[in-house]
Swiss-Prot record:
This is Uracil phosphoribosyltransferase. It comes from Pseudomonas fluorescens (strain ATCC BAA-477 / NRRL B-23932 / Pf-5). 5-phospho-alpha-D-ribose 1-diphosphate binds at R78, R103, D130, P131, M132, L133, A134, T135, G136, S137, S138, D199. The keyword Transferase applies. Allosterically activated by GTP. The gene is upp. Transmembrane segments: none annotated.
């Protein structure tokens, strides 16, 4: 499984701002969208193109457009919603599927409680978005669901990834590429990424925050 850590200066700068303990909900939310957009740029660099002709100001002009499969963006609820607007700013024509996954705070295992997939999803490139790849259980559960629905071209974008989560996805789904802004050090005993961002969902939605 390719894991691609995107160390672009803009991403590094914005991620550094997101790590502040005293960051406001507004700023965290805006930065999550911005980094999500930058990751989308990298995750779509290899999409195929095809030429076609349009009427230009001086006559017919050959231009290019994205060819091949259509795209569905798959936010893992709820935190994945925090990256959605940034992703759609670059691919506004993409359809949105949604997968709700809850993690048991004691066992750290995930279970799926909601799936709203677009029609003919098996014919689309599925791009999963979730701010944190911690234990990997939510990501694995989502990929399991998408593959069961017929998806064969799946990519994932996360703001921060832990080595444990990367290993879990690699073991279960070695064909899925993960794009991340940072590979962090480890998980703590509560399954939170160190140094991480804290609870990304709480910070995006302004609910009670937990320690990272």
């Amino acid at each position: 499984m390719p894991i691609r850590e995107i160390r672009h200066p803009l991403i590094r700068h914005k991620l550094g701002l997101m790590r502040r303990a005293d960051i406001s909900t507004k700023n965290f939310r805006e930065l999550a969208q911005e980094v999500g957009a930058l990751l989308t740029y990298e995750a779509t660099k290899d999409l195929p193109l095809e030429s076609y002709e349009i009427p230009g100001w001086c006559g017919p002009v050959q231009v290019e457009k994205i060819a091949g499969k259509k795209i569905t963006v798959v936010p893992i609820l709820r935190a994945g919603i925090g990256m959605l607007e940034g992703v759609l700013s670059l691919i506004p024509g993409a359809k949105v599927s949604a997968v709700g996954v809850a993690r048991n705070e004691e066992t750290l295992q995930a279970h799926t409680y909601l799936e709203k997939l677009v029609p003919e999803i098996d014919e689309r490139l599925a791009m999963i978005i979730d701010p944190m790849l911690a234990t990997g259980s939510s990501m694995v559960a989502t990929i399991d669901l998408l593959k069961k629905a017929g998806c064969r071209d799946i990519r994932a974008m996360v703001l921060v990834a832990a080595p444990e989560g990367i290993a879990a996805v690699e073991q279960a789904h070695p064909d899925v590429t993960i794009y991340t802004a940072s590979i962090d050090q480890k998980l703590n005993e509560h399954g939170y990424i160190i140094p991480g961002l804290g609870d990304a969902g709480d910070k995006i939605f302004g609910t009670k925050q937990k320690d990272s």
